Amino acid sequence: MDHRLVAWAREVKARERRRDPPARNIPVLWLFTDALRVPDPQAAVAALPRRLCGVVFRHDGAAGRAALAKAVSRQCRTLAIPLVVAGNARLAAAVGAGVHLRNGRRTADGGLRRWLRPAALVTSSAHSGADLRRARTMGADAVFLSPTLPTRSHPGAPALGIVRWAALARLARNEGMALGGVEGRMVRRLPRWCRGAGAIGALMAAGADDVCCRAATVFRDCHN
């Protein structure tokens, strides 16, 4: 667990509380699950700081994804941790979660409000102004602008960098969050009006992400 990142997130949350009018109660720090880097999402969720975090459940293509989503949803309700399911509004509704859109696009199962309850959270990723506009049209409560910096999930992929991230975040108005390469040692380079961040390795136990990243690298090498 990156305690510098957690401390920064607590400061962001304190600023959010002082806003006038107060912002909707949206977590400022989000764990993004990943079948390779977070093989045990329930253990990762159990370790999250309380009253600060949300969870974006991905685990795309994982065997038993629906059953795992149901188990994670039950755990998140017990711990009062908001949960969104990536890319599948029908599954999100079935487990009582919100939904996470990719690039602001509709989910493959026919959209959002057809399945979700009215108060359900909607988050989205965005890599460009066009993605951001789609996300806002879809009513996203939070938009993760990514990749902010080089990330271990996508080695070699081009990153926005702090300057481009800030320019895109200004277009996001009140919804912009950072995702990709987010760690405590860099997060204070983000503008003070950053609304929060998403992370994988920084929210896992010390050393756990290194092991999972090596396993993921071997997996990718064997399947390329």
Please provide the spans of the model-predicted regions.
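N-terminal amphipathic alpha-helix/helix-capping segment at the start of soluble metabolic enzymes
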Residues: 1-43, 114, 219-224
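N-terminal ligand-binding/catalytic initiation module
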Residues: 21-26, 48, 203-206
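Catalytic beta/alpha-barrel core
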Residues: 30-35, 53-135, 144-147, 178
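Glycine-rich phosphate-binding active-site loops on the catalytic face of alpha/beta enzymes
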Residues: 31, 103-114, 142-156, 184-224
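Short secondary-structure boundary/capping elements
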Residues: 36-40, 127, 160
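A short, Lys/Arg-enriched amphipathic alpha-helix followed by its capping loop at the start of a domain
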Residues: 43-53
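Catalytic cores of alpha/beta
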Residues: 44, 83-98, 127-139, 165-199, ...
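Charged helix-capping and loop-helix junction motifs
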Residues: 69-70, 157-166
